[in-house]
Amino acid sequence: MTQHSPYSSAMAEQRHQEWLRFVELLRQSYDKDLHLPLLQLMLTPDEREALGTRVRIIEELLRGEMSQRELKNELGAGIATITRGSNSLKSAPVELRQWLEQILLGAQR
């Protein structure tokens, strides 16, 4: 009997479709001004806090004034979380990075 890995291509595709479904649900919730209640329903307080921390990590990485170790101490995040953020930012599309710089750093320039 073949056991299916939770990371099989069929499972990965299903998870991707579920993610896209959530993203579309979130998009639609903005049209009805229900995005905050939806996110409060879908995310635990810890998950919401983690997302806020990740935004700060990306913001500080874009600013480029602190080392990853300084970020770890400043934000109380694990070095692995900061490294993942850094790696994700490096592989992000140029348009996304430019948009993030404009949104997160624009008021400070």
Curated annotation (Swiss-Prot):
<comment type="function">
    <text>This protein is an aporepressor. When complexed with L-tryptophan it binds the operator region of the trp operon (5'-ACTAGT-'3') and prevents the initiation of transcription. The complex also regulates trp repressor biosynthesis by binding to its regulatory region.</text>
</comment>
<keyword id="KW-0804">Transcription</keyword>
<comment type="similarity">
    <text>Belongs to the TrpR family.</text>
</comment>
<keyword id="KW-0805">Transcription regulation</keyword>
<feature type="DNA-binding region">
    <location>
        <begin position="68"/>
        <end position="91"/>
    </location>
</feature>
<dbReference type="GO" id="GO:0005737">
    <property type="term" value="C:cytoplasm"/>
</dbReference>
<keyword id="KW-0238">DNA-binding</keyword>
<dbReference type="InterPro" id="IPR038116">
    <property type="entry name" value="TrpR-like_sf"/>
</dbReference>
<dbReference type="InterPro" id="IPR000831">
    <property type="entry name" value="Trp_repress"/>
</dbReference>
<dbReference type="GO" id="GO:0003700">
    <property type="term" value="F:DNA-binding transcription factor activity"/>
</dbReference>
<keyword id="KW-0678">Repressor</keyword>
<dbReference type="GO" id="GO:0045892">
    <property type="term" value="P:negative regulation of DNA-templated transcription"/>
</dbReference>
<comment type="subunit">
    <text>Homodimer.</text>
</comment>
<dbReference type="GO" id="GO:0043565">
    <property type="term" value="F:sequence-specific DNA binding"/>
</dbReference>
<dbReference type="Pfam" id="PF01371">
    <property type="entry name" value="Trp_repressor"/>
</dbReference>
<keyword id="KW-0963">Cytoplasm</keyword>
<dbReference type="InterPro" id="IPR013335">
    <property type="entry name" value="Trp_repress_bac"/>
</dbReference>
<protein>
    <recommendedName>
        <fullName>Trp operon repressor</fullName>
    </recommendedName>
</protein>
<dbReference type="InterPro" id="IPR010921">
    <property type="entry name" value="Trp_repressor/repl_initiator"/>
</dbReference>
